[in-house]
């Protein structure tokens, strides 16, 4: 509006107020109404309004932002029109106010127009002569209507107010920027955490791989030495391998050496012994150190993979299998292979009981020096037994090759052998449940050799003296010294007649033809021993026939009428289960059939003894139309005369070759008190003198 268009109630020519009045008017708050009121400014409340509220003039939409109290236009003595005010926007700092703008920094007191300089402009502006100017300078309506900070309008129109309002704007902007940065910071933290977690997972994976490699290096010690064939951990079933008797070996009694020899098993025990990981067949002779020093033990123990296979705690039963002993260690354990420690002797040598420094008992089978036959058996036993681990089989726990000395080390079982309890001086009679348990356990062990080993293993020396018993009378099949690895397509393994007379199958005794059914025949003879309590061959000469010849017709009659009284051991006093007796008699009769093809497999015998198969299932080994029990009536079967002729021929061969009984480890010196079945050579001599030439046997 023009200069002369002031409100009617406004004074026509406002005189410049005194400095004091101007101060009071400057401090007065603008009128409450939005319109430019003509009323003179009433004395407002005290100074706190002017100092405390920088009335932003921005909310008055019709007028541009006030010049922020810098009404310093040239010659505008209280008549600041709109145009001048518009021109003064942004010129708040000019020098046209004649030094009146010394207090330009009004700290946001934009609307009062009182620069506290006492100039004419201040007085004119405070009198409200210019409505628009008052609206802009005094912020009459804007002061009441604009609680928000002088934001948008003042920012656009005047550069200096933004300076006063800069802190709020910058703070608002800062809050926005910080809000935008928060997600970025969280994302960065998440990425870093994920990368760290991935790194930890990779480290754990590498550690697991390293441990697996170390475990693999432990087994090569045995596998690389020809001990393990991948049949599983050789040391996981040591709890079952508590057997140690018969060990075919020479008894060269050498002066005992000092007793502080340590066994490979004892982790740090004093006696040194060398525990070398070298394979048994060609291992180098035991190196120095037979003096029993712990240093020798540690040096020999280290081997290629020694540290990776720490010796087990002494409480573990004999620890590792197939460990190398020094001769001095075994001599010390057996008190110099003294007679008091002699368990038995046989064609290969002697068996001595030994006690290791850690208190464990062992049985040491030593081979006769210079016995080529014994050396061959030693090689076979070390190679085969080390590959076999089963609950019902004996495991080789150590060996010794020192120059010409070759010895096998087994766990010692204090419960002796089946032969001892059946025919020895134990003074106790095995009850029927124990006999059945022994039969079942030995059948499972032999079935494992025949059907679960690859290549399969034929024992070739099944007999009562090779069935060891633990404290609970669990059976353990022992002495694989005669066993040979037999490929499926190879049946003629050896012409050397091994084994014990009375247990040999007819076809094997006559021709040396070897199959798993030869072991079945020997097992059938052992079952007859359990049932009858008789030996395979009568050593007294009172019974001309063998146990098999005597029992065959009785088994047939018992199967027909169910009367087993003539067959059963009288010491049992008829204390047995009839159906269990029928099962065992049927298994024995089927196993000793003349025809090898008609004998059942060991797995079939196991099922029959457990009661899981009918007796007719035992005939599955034969051809259709043949007798299901004893195999009679078939032209392919041996008759009694043929079998007897074969036995006579075998007796003559055994006498001439002196190989009979070579596999037996117990002789007259056996602690069992009686000659074992293998020592029936005297009976052979008695009967062999009367034998005539026999026709060659036929195996159809």
Curated annotation (Swiss-Prot):
The keyword Repeat does not apply. Keywords: ATP-binding, Cell membrane, Glycoprotein, Kinase, Membrane, Nucleotide-binding, Phosphoprotein, Receptor, Serine/threonine-protein kinase, Transferase, Transmembrane, Transmembrane helix. Mostly expressed in flower buds. Its main location: membrane. SUPFAM superfamilies: Protein kinase-like (PK-like). Residues 9-19, 29-47, 266-286 have a biased composition (Pro residues). Residues 1-180, 249-315, 616-642, 659-700 are annotated as: Disordered. ATP binds at residues 343-351, 365. Residues 689-700 have a biased composition (Polar residues). Its EC number is 2.7.11.1. It is a single-pass membrane protein. Residues 208-700 are cytoplasmic. It catalyses: L-seryl-[protein] + ATP = O-phospho-L-seryl-[protein] + ADP + H(+); L-threonyl-[protein] + ATP = O-phospho-L-threonyl-[protein] + ADP + H(+). One of its GO terms (molecular function) is protein serine kinase activity. The active site is at residue 461. Residues 48-137, 255-265 have a biased composition (Low complexity). It is an enzyme of class 2 (transferase). GO terms for cellular component: plasma membrane. The modification Phosphoserine is found at residues 465, 494. Pfam families: PK_Tyr_Ser-Thr. Belongs to the protein kinase superfamily. Ser/Thr protein kinase family. PANTHER family: PROLINE-RICH RECEPTOR-LIKE PROTEIN KINASE PERK4 (PTHR47982), PROLINE-RICH RECEPTOR-LIKE PROTEIN KINASE PERK6-RELATED (PTHR47982:SF47). This is Putative proline-rich receptor-like protein kinase PERK6. It comes from Arabidopsis thaliana. The lineage of its organism: Eukaryota, Viridiplantae, Streptophyta, Embryophyta, Tracheophyta. The gene is PERK6.
């Amino acid at each position: 509006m023009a200069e002369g268009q002031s409100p009617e109630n406004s004074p026509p020519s406002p005189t410049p107020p005194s400095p004091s009045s101007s101060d009071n008017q400057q401090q007065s708050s603008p009128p409450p109404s939005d319109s430019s009121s003509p009323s003179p400014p009433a004395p407002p409340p005290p100074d706190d309004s002017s100092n405390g509220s920088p009335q932003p003039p921005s909310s008055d939409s019709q007028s541009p932002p006030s010049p922020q109290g810098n009404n310093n236009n040239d010659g505008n003595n209280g008549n600041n029109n709109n145009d001048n005010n518009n021109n003064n926007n942004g010129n708040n700092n000019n020098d046209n106010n004649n030094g009146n703008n010394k207090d330009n920094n009004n700290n946001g007191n934009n609307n009062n127009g009182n620069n506290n300089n006492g100039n004419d402009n201040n007085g004119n502006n405070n009198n409200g002569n210019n409505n628009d100017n008052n609206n802009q300078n005094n912020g009459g309506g804007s002061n009441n209507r604009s609680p928000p900070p002088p934001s948008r309008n003042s920012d656009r129109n005047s550069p200096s107010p933004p300076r006063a309002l800069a802190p709020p704007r910058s703070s608002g902007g800062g809050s926005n920027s910080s809000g935008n940065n928060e997600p970025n910071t969280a994302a960065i933290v998440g990425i870093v955490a994920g990368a760290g977690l991935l790194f930890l997972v990779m480290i754990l994976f590498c550690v697991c791989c390293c441990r697996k490699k170390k475990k693999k290096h432990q087994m090569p010690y045995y596998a690389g030495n020809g001990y393990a064939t991948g049949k599983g951990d050789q040391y996981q079933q040591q709890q079952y391998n508590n057997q140690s008797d018969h060990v075919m070996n020479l008894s060269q009694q050498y002066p005992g050496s000092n007793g502080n020899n340590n066994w490979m098993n004892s982790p740090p025990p004093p006696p040194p012994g060398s525990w070398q990981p070298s394979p048994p067949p060609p291992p180098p002779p035991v190196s120095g150190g037979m003096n029993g020093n712990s240093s020798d033990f540690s040096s020999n123990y280290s081997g290629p993979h020694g540290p990776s296979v720490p010796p087990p705690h002494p409480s573990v039963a004999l620890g590792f299998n197939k460990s190398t002993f020094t001769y001095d260690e075994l001599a010390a354990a057996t008190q110099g292979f003294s007679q008091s420690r002699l368990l038995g002797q046989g064609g290969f040598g002697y068996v001595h009981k030994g006690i290791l420094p850690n208190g464990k008992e062992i049985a040491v089978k030593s081979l006769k020096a210079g016995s080529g036959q014994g050396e061959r058996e030693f090689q076979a036993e070390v190679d085969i037994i080390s590959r076999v681990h089963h609950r019902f089989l004996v495991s080789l726990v150590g060996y010794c090759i020192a120059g010409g000395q070759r010895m096998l080390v087994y766990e010692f079982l204090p419960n002796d052998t089946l032969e001892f309890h059946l025919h020895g001086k134990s003074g106790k009679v095995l009850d029927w449940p124990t006999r059945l348990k022994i039969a079942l356990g030995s059948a499972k062990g032999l079935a494992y050799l025949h059907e679960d080993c690859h290549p399969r293993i034929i024992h070739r020396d099944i007999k009562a003296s090779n069935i060891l018993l633990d404290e609970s009378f669990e059976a353990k099949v022992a002495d694989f010294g005669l066993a040979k690895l037999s490929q499926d397509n190879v049946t003629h393994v050896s012409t050397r007649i091994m084994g014990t007379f009375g247990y040999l199958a007819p076809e094997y005794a006559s021709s040396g033809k070897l199959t798993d059914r030869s072991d079945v025949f020997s097992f059938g003879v052992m079952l007859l021993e359990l049932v009858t309590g008789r030996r395979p061959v009568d050593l007294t000469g009172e019974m001309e026939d063998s146990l098999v010849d005597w029992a065959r017709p009785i088994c047939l009659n018992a199967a027909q009428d169910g009367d087993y009284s003539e067959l059963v051991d009288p010491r049992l006093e008829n204390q047995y289960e009839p159906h269990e007796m029928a099962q065992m008699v049927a298994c024995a009769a089927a196993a000793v059939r003349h025809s090898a093809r008609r004998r059942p497999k060991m797995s079939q015998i196991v099922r029959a003894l457990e009661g899981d198969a009918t007796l007719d299932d035992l005939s599955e080994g034969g051809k259709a139309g043949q007798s299901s029990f004893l195999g009679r009536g078939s032209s392919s079967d041996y008759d009694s005369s043929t079998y007897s002729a074969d036995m006579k021929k075998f007796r003559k061969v055994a006498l001439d070759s002196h190989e009979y009984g070579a596999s037996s480890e117990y002789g007259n010196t056996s602690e069992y008190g009686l000659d074992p079945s293998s020592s029936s050579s005297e009976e052979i001599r008695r009967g062999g003198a009367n034998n005539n030439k026999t026709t060659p046997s036929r195996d159809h």
